[in-house]
Structure formats: C-alpha cells, structure tokens
C-alpha cells in the first residue's frame, strides 16, 4: 500500500506566535520545505462527531490576504461538498457566500 506524508514546521517567536510556517509532502513536486503564510487544517473526529481544527497564520500576513485565504478555503469546501456528496444546492450556497464576501473584500481595499 502506498503511503503519503505531510509535514509542518512552525517557527514561533518568544510569545508562541508563528513567525514562519513551512510544509513538505512526499507527493509534492518540489523537494524540501516550502514557506506559507497560513494553514487551515480540519480533521473529522468520527467518535465525537465533530471537527478538530488547526488554524495558524504568521504575524506578517496582511488582514486582506487573510480574508481572501478564508474565502478561498470556503470555495474549496464548496467543491469538496459537491465532489463528496453531489449536493449541488449546498455547494451553490457556499459559492454564493464566497462571491458576496469577495465583493466586500474588494470594496475594503
């Protein structure tokens, strides 16, 4: 059986605030760690029937980039819902929310 691994390395300042987020994966085309400004990881706990989340971002990430990041995460969820369940209505509602949020972000820039 094939196995894949994803690794995260988080460099923290003296107050435990992320200064650098690095990641690597066995299936990534580039070799070595790649820097990112934010990660949002969700894991389904099937025993507790809830989601465990890890959200990290560097202190250097601008607020508008953070907003765009979360809008993009929601858009990815819309596609995942469609792929996993075939629920076009739910996927469409999430995409509609993304469009409204994107308009608000553009207005604030």
Enumerate the language-model features and the residues they cover:
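C-terminal charged interaction modules
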Residues: 78-109
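Active-site and channel-lining beta-strand-loop segments
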Residues: 6-25
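Short loop/turn motifs at secondary-structure junctions and domain boundaries
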Residues: 1-4
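Active-site- and interface-proximal helix/loop "cap" or "latch" segments in soluble metabolic
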Residues: 19-85
């Amino acid at each position: 059986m094939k196995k894949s691994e994803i690794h995260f390395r988080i460099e923290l300042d003296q107050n435990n605030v992320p200064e650098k987020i690095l990641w690597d994966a066995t299936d990534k085309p580039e070799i070595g760690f790649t820097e990112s400004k934010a990660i949002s990881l969700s894991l389904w706990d099937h025993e507790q029937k809830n989601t465990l989340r890890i959200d990290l971002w560097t202190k250097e990430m601008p607020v508008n980039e953070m907003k765009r990041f979360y809008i993009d995460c929601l858009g990815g969820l819309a596609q995942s819902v469609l792929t996993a369940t075939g629920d076009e209505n739910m996927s469409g509602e999430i995409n509609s929310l993304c469009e409204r949020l994107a308009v608000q972000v553009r207005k604030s820039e």
